[in-house]
Amino acid sequence: MNWDEYALSIAEVVAKKSKDPWRQVGAVLLRHDNTVAACGYNGFPPHMEEDWSCRDKRRNYVVHAEQNALRHVRPLECYLLASTTLPCNDCLKSLASYGIKRIVYRETYPTDESTTLLASEFNIALINV
């Protein structure tokens, strides 16, 4: 098992913590020595009522797994994000600002083309496993 597969297997376990009935996303950040720095999953912010039945509320308030993982690291501390789903463009911008240079993921979104172009501009390698 290589480091990409290792990190992605952890992300898949972390995703199971999400209470989102439509999409459970998990993310893991690896440091330069391949130790796990942080994990995150998609969900409502702490102390907020979790109303998964309202699509608009869910879309407006849910914090993405990648953002939840980034809250626990310093910029340039990590090089790799493993996510069960390809990050959205907003998450990709945040990941670039933290110095992430490699993203491994399992599932994709319909917005893949714009995400691929943005990742290329940020010099981030996207690897679909």
Predicted features, each with a name:
Residues M1-V129:
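Zinc-dependent deaminase catalytic domain
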